[in-house]
Structure formats: C-alpha cells, structure tokens
Design a protein with these regions (language model features):
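Phosphate-coordination loops involved in phosphoryl transfer and adenosine-cofactor binding
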Residues: 34-39, 142-144, 228
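Phosphate/diphosphate ligand-binding glycine-rich loop within oxidoreductases
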Residues: 34-135, 238-239, 243
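Glycine-rich phosphate/diphosphate-binding loop of Rossmann-like nucleotide-binding domains
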Residues: 44-56, 135-201
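Rossmann-like adenosine-cofactor binding region
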Residues: 181-253
C-alpha cells in the first residue's frame, strides 16, 4: 500500500487493516514512526480541520510537517520536475487539490506515498475516519443502511465510493436534478429516512437551498429512522440549511 488516492484502489480487508493499525497507534505504538522524516502538505488557506489533524498526527508520530499552498502545484513548472525535487526531500506528500488526476500524476512521479486530502470527486481520509469511528460504536456498520442527504459533490461521491468497497447499502435524498446516479434517491427527507440507520449530510451551496427545502434533516425526520439511528453531518455544517438547529443538539448527533 503506497498511496491513498481512491478507496476503490483497495479491498475491504485492506481498510480493516488500517483500522487495526489505528487501534495500535491509539495504544501508543509507533510514537517515533516519523522521527527524522518530513511530510510535505499542500492545502488551501481555507482548510481548518483536515490540516490541523494531519499536522498534529505527523507531530505526534515524531515527524516534521512542511506546509505549502495548494496553488503551488498549479505553477507553470512541470509537475514531474516538482516531484523530482520532492523525491529528495519528502518522506510523504499529502495534498488537497480539486483535480484528482493531478494527484494520480504525483503518485506516478513520486517514490514516496501520496495521500489524497480531498478532491472535487472524493475524500478518502474523511471516509476512513468516519467508518473507523462508526466501527467503534456500531455492532457492524457495514450492515447498517446509510442515507446521504446532499448533492453530487465530493462528500456524496466519497460515500458512494466507500459503499462500493465496504458493501453497505447507500441511498440518497436530494433535490430533483442533484442525483449522483447508481443509487435509489428520494426528494423528501420523511420518505428517505425510513428504515435508515446512519444519516450523512453535506453542506449546500446557496443556489441549491430552495431545491433542497424538502430535504432538511430535523428531529422529526430522525424519529422516522430506525431506532438508535445516528446523524453524521460532514463539517462545515449549517444549522437551518441541510440540518435543523434542534437536530444538531439532539441525542442523534454523531
């Protein structure tokens, strides 16, 4: 396992191995795994959660995070040349960039691992984190029925990617015309949530709010889901838009 670009590059057993490794890290193993090593990060200035958690994780494992703006990868200089230099200096490269094909090219040119920290079509580390957390609170999250509330963006496509690898059932609730394809979809949250165990959301662009007015996750909607169903909103979330203020303060929140 060299790179993490798409979850679909791996099998379910590979992801379970990552979960086991995560358990070992949490138990205090590998504290000096990255001692004397440098991790090069490419992130936009707007990133908060992902960059903080990556930098802290690298630090706790003894490594040195070195941060650049994502725009650095869009310069005129040939990407092959940039990666040639990084091969001498970096031990791992972690990048957030809208174009997944750029990350795939980096993985081709680099001799060190490349980690996808989000693109326009997926977010594998977000999915690994969510599924690992679910594995700690659910008997078998792959047997749960998932509902994604949102449009055809990177988070929805990421959940679809995860479902293909892990085999859990996934359906979508969205405004008309926002369907991802390949999934059963609903245009009303009260119909969509029936029989579901895990309700996942993504934030909405202002232009889509009217189209999603029947899709807001509320406490009343969560009561229509299965017993012990949980709400897993992807941050940043916006109260009064994809989720109600009340449901974000309820016992259903994950």
């Amino acid at each position: 396992m060299k790179d993490m670009i798409r979850l679909t590059d791996y099998k379910a057993d590979d992801l379970y191995d990552i979960f086991k490794l995560t358990d070992e890290v949490r138990q205090g193993k590998y504290q000096d795994l990255l001692k004397g090593k440098s991790a090069i990060l490419f992130f936009p200035n707007s990133s908060i959660r992902t960059i903080v958690t990556f930098e802290k994780g690298i630090y706790l494992l003894g490594g040195q995070p070195i941060l650049f703006s994502t725009e650095t990868l869009d310069k005129k200089e040939d990407l092959r040349d940039v990666c040639g230099y990084l091969n001498h200096w970096a031990d791992i490269v972690i990048a957030r960039h809208k174009d997944i094909h750029l990350l795939e090219k980096m993985a081709e040119y680099l001799e060190v691992p490349v980690i996808n920290a989000m693109t326009d079509v997926n977010h594998p580390c977000e999915m690994l984190t969510d599924m690992y957390a679910l594995s700690k609170i659910r008997k078998d999250f792959t047997k749960d029925r998932f509902l994604f509330v949102g449009g055809k963006g990177n988070i929805g496509l990421a959940w679809q990617e995860a479902s293909r690898v892990m085999g859990f059932e996934l359906q979508q609730c969205c405004g008309q015309g926002y369907e991802m394809g390949g999934l059963m979809s609903y245009n009303n949250i009260y119909d969509a949530v029936v029989g579901k165990d895990i309700v996942c959301t993504d934030s909405l662009p202002a232009s889509a709010l009217t189209d999603f007015k029947e899709c807001q996750v509320t406490t009343a909607a969560m009561k229509m889901a299965n017993e012990d169903a949980i709400l897993n909103p992807c941050p940043p979330f916006y109260r009064g838009e994809e989720v109600s203020k009340e449901v974000m303060e309820s016992k259903n929140i994950f």
